[in-house]
Design a protein with these regions (language model features):
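Short, glycine/charged-rich "phosphate-handling" switch motifs in NTP-dependent
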Residues: 99
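Active-site residues of response regulator receiver
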Residues: 52, 82
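Active-site beta3 strand of CheY-like receiver
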Residues: 45-50
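Receiver (REC) domain active-site loop signature in two-component systems and cognate sites
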Residues: 55
C-alpha cells in the first residue's frame, strides 16, 4: 500500500486530504507543519509527500529542501498543495525539488489524478 505523508497547518485541509486519500486506498499520515513532517519522514519512509507551502515553524519549501537532502527522499514525489499561485513561488518550489503544484481550494479528483500521475 502506498504510504503518503500530508503536511498542512490547517486541520480542515489535513482532514480533507486524509479522508480523500484513505477513501482511495492509500495509507496516510498527517503532520501539522514542516518540522513535524520532517521528523515523521526521518522515522518512516513515505512513498509520496504532500505539503502546504506556508506553515509555521518550517514551511513547505524548507521541507522539500530538507527531504531532497536525504538520499532516501531524493526521488520521492513531493506535491505542494497551497494557496500560492504566483509564478515566482512555483519556480521556488520547482527549484527546491517539488514534483507538482496544486492550488487550494482543491478538487479531490484532481488530487487523486495528480497523485496517480507521479507514483
Amino acid at each position: 500500500m502506498t504510504k503518503i505523508l500530508a503536511a498542512d497547518d490547517s486541520v480542515s485541509i489535513r482532514q480533507m486530504v486524509s479522508h480523500t486519500l484513505k477513501d482511495a486506498g492509500y495509507d496516510v499520515e498527517t503532520a501539522n507543519d514542516g518540522s513535524d513532517a520532517l521528523k515523521k519522514a526521518q522515522a518512516t519512509k513515505f512513498d509520496v509527500v504532500i505539503s502546504d507551502v506556508n506553515m509555521p515553524i518550517m514551511g513547505g519549501l524548507e521541507l522539500v529542501k530538507a527531504l531532497r537532502g536525504n538520499p532516501q527522499y531524493k526521488f520521492t514525489p513531493i506535491l505542494m498543495l497551497t494557496t500560492e499561485t504566483s509564478a515566482e513561488k512555483k519556480q521556488q518550489g520547482k527549484a527546491a525539488g517539488a514534483t507538482g503544484w496544486l492550488v487550494k481550494p482543491f478538487n479531490p479528483d484532481t488530487l487523486l489524478k495528480t497523485l496517480k500521475r507521479v507514483i
